[in-house]
Amino acid sequence: MHSKDMDFVQMFVCFLLCWTGVDAVFNLKYTVEEELRAGTKIANVTADAKVAGFALGNRQPYLRVISNSEPRWVNLSPAGLLITKQKIDRDAVCRQTPKCFISLEVMSNSMEICVIKIEIIDVNDNAPRFPTNHIDIEISENAAPGTRFPLEGASDPDSGSNGIQTYTITPNDIFGLEIKTRGDGSKIAELVVEKTLDRETQSRYTFELTAEDGGDPPKSGTVQLNIKVIDSNDNNPVFDEPVYTVNVLENSPINTLVIDLNATDPDEGTNGEVVYSFINFVSNLTKQMFKIDPKTGVITVNGVLDHEELHIHEIDVQAKDLGPNSIPAHCKVIVNVIDINDNAPEIKLLSENSEMVEVSENAPLGYVIALVRVSDNDSGANGKVQCRLQGNVPFRLNEFESFSTLLVDGRLDREQRDMYNLTILAEDSGYPPLRSSKSFAVKVTDENDNPPYFTKPHYQAMVLENNVPGAFLLAVSARDPDLGMNGTVSYEIIKSEVRGMSVESYVTVNSNGEIYGVRAFNHEDTRTFEFKVSAKDGGDPPLTSNATVRIVVLDVNDNTPVMTTPPLVNGTAEVSIPKNAGVGYLVTQIKADDYDEGENGRLTYSISEGDMAYFEIDQINGEVRTTKTFGENAKPSYQITVVAHDHGQTSLSASAYIVIYLSPDLNAQEQIGPVNLSLIFIIALGSIAVILFVTMIFVAVKCKRDNKEIRTYNCRVAEYSYGNQKKSSKKKKLSKNDIRLVPRDVEETDKMNVVSCSSLTSSLNYFDYHQQTLPLGCRRSESTFLNVENQNSRNAAPNHGYHHTFTGQGPQQPDLIINGMPLPETENYSIDSSYVNSRAHLIKSTSTFKDMEGNSLKDSGHEESDQTDSEHDVQRGHYADTAVNDVLNMTVPSNNSQIPDQDQSEGFHCQDECRILGHSDRCWMPRVPIPARAKSPEHGRNVIALSIEATTVDVPHYEDCGTTKRTFATFGKDGPDEDRAEQRGRRQTAEPAVCSPKTNGAVREAGNGREAVSPITSPVHLKSPQSKASSTYNTLKCRDAERIANHSLLRQPEGKDSEPAMREINTLLQDGRDKESPGSKRLKDIVL
């Protein structure tokens, strides 16, 4: 509170003391910060009064505030609590006083007075604030450095150190800031000019002025300080040049620009505003011919210039600013008046409207649009004028003596261009020539030359069925580029029929091309229809064009399903089923029709009510079937309600009430369900597939059997040799008689007889000691003579394949025969000393012979080998037995040897089983007598030599040795041996090929003989031949070869074990080396 208020309080307190006679007066002082919210407790006066000696007596204390001193900021309760009434704002209570107090006087019930003073402590809750957002100061550029300009200060309601303490300005070199303190303690700022100002260099400055208080933390406020430098008239106007020279044509029109003068003054305002004027001593003629604009300095022609009167004008001009003490600037302008052809041609358009002429777009070429007249007041050549049209336009000028005509010179089309701006240029013959121009417009008027055209040739609209008659369907649009009535288009529907009715009964079109439906469409009746719309303009005659409109009527779910099966009577159908019907029994099938399409017509069936526990329905096909059996206590009838509803967006449905009677007379087994065509179709396809599969298997088996017969029954020698083997396990020792020399008295002395058979092949497979049969290479055997080969031919290429070629050696080199058969040489088994002396090599070697199926050697009468036959023995002698004991006994007889014929009624090989089961092929094989051993001196040289050679070539092809299919089951049963021999002879005469591999390879010369090298083959690759045999082979009849082979087989009926045989062979070979006989010498050569 102010001091005056405090004095009044003290005086009032003294008055109370004197008037009431109080006992004592006490003082209490409190200090609080401003901005306390209402209801804040300041102190407990009762407690503080006791401390201060304020005796309240023994009575209950009671305090009251004297009414004249009650403040509006605080409140004292009777119990002595001092509380704020409202938020205390020191700045509102005490303004700018250094200290702020509020006081109140309190009287107790003991008549004692207490004076309470509350000091309000200032809080820095206000930031300095400037009265405006910017401060503008104008300073003359003549202001000297050190000049001060007071600035408007900021205000801060806070006091003391929380008030404004300082001002700052944006740092710069031109102005500074000085802070001063007033008498009331407030701070003010003064702007100080520190450097000379130049407005022409910089006319404005902008800084930021900041006021900051002393609070903690301090608060601040800012304002923008704008300083404008005021100009002073310290510059004079200056012209660009002191003298200007210009040329002006005579008869130049008034206001023709002569020159634009420019004098600059860098001062501002009136100090820089320049005015122009002629100097007072300029002649009056010059002032009449020319004038100058005081503000712009533009000199223009003010009269008629005539070169003949005065051809030079000198004009003196001055320029000065409007500032005080202005100093003017001067310049001189020299004007030369140029003599010229000063009369230009004049052009006039002789038409009703000199600015525009009209022409129809159908105007023909040469059509006259307007007349043009051109004149020139000059005489002579200066008055002779030529005219032309400017630009590329479909017009031309036709010039005559005194006028010209404007003609159409091209096709006009208003739709392309409806207006032409023409300019006629006229030029006289003066020097320089004068030109003039005349511009006018040519408007092309419209003709009805364009028919309307639709924006597209086909329109389509989709509308839902059951539309409201008169509903908008679509709009067609046609355009006509013509104007007026020629471009006004009207529409109409071309007459046609839709389902036998006029199309106008379906749709209509208005003048704007909007098509509306006349009737409600039905998708089920009319799904789509087309019609044509004609667009016609208003020309005379009118032009038309057409467009096709297609209306597609979309389906709406507007058809309720209709029950068709079973037949309903008043919505009810009765069905009878057997009482003993089981689960899944077909009661009936519900069928309904819906004429809608898609989802609107797809129906689903369901049972909505009734005896649903006993029946169920297929949602798709509507079959009603039982779900449980009916017992003895079943009702006589059951009822269900079947509903068929479609799948439209708003589903429609139909229901049927089905009464199902249980009849004991019907039998549940008599039901024949509906035919499932899909199942029948699948079963039929499966049956066809099975039949085809079985047929393929049958054909494959038959082909395999035929191939087996072709591969198996082709060499009779092997067939006879195997047939003479006995089941006896008794082994016969090899004697010297088993090795014999073959006499040389055969048909040709330089050839030897070799049984050619595809079974004499070399295989890279390991030797199978459990194979029981000898596979034969062809169905009949033939003997082939080979030319004698020189000894040097033994150095042939090594074996690289499966097949070998047998070649003869020289006549002086006998070969080794074991049991009538030459010992073969394979790629793993060679006839040399190491192999002969090594048992292990012989056992591990691979033979050129392959066992044939033993089952095929015995016929049980069932046309094929029967493995259950008594002759079938899987433990029969091994291939080595046949190869060493039986096959080696086959020798080549001389020409004088006779082979006796066998009994035709019963063969030599017949057994008791033949009388019961029938004869087999082996029964008809003739018995060949054992030939006498040759004692000729040359016996040692005439032997069969087998030389194993191989050449790596393509797989050979075997030729079928007979056209008649032969097996062991049919051999000897299709005719006598003589007939078969004749047939074979005829075949061999016409076809001299052999069964051995075809010699597609080269035939190499070697000494006096020739070596036929056969291609490599494998027993498993038997193909048809590609070429005939080499001429090196001479073929014998198979019958002769069979007799020779059989003759040897009869001498050795039993098999021979390979190991004992080889031991005996080694012994014999050792004996032969000691004697050095020709035969042993030949054997040594073979072995080496």
Curated annotation (Swiss-Prot):
Primary subcellular site in the record, as a coarse category: membrane
Gene Ontology CC terms: membrane; plasma membrane; postsynapse
Protein name from the UniProt record: Protocadherin-19
Glycan attachment points: 44, 262, 284, 377, 421, 486, 546, 570, 676
Any one GO BP annotation for this protein: brain morphogenesis
Tissue: In the embryo, strongly expressed in the developing nervous system. At 12 hours post fertilization (hpf), shows a segmental expression pattern in the anterior third of the neural keel with strong expression in the presumptive forebrain, cerebellum/rhombomere 1 and rhombomere 4. By 24 hpf, expressed widely in the brain and spinal cord with higher expression levels in the ventral telencephalon, dorsal and central thalamus, optic tectum, central tegmentum, cerebellum and dorsolateral regions of the hindbrain.
Binding site for Ca(2+) 14: 465, 524, 555-556, 558, 596
SUPFAM superfamilies membership: Cadherin-like
Cytoplasmic side: 700-1088
Localization in the cell: Cell membrane
Mutation effect (residue 28 to P): Does not affect interaction with cdh2 or adhesion activity
Residues that bind Ca(2+) 5: 141, 200, 231-232, 234, 267
GO molecular function, one term: cadherin binding
Disulfide linkage: 94-100
Residues reported to bind Ca(2+) 8: 250, 308, 339-340, 342, 378
Residue numbers binding Ca(2+) 4: 141, 200, 234
Residues involved in Ca(2+) 15 binding: 557, 559, 594, 596, 600, 646
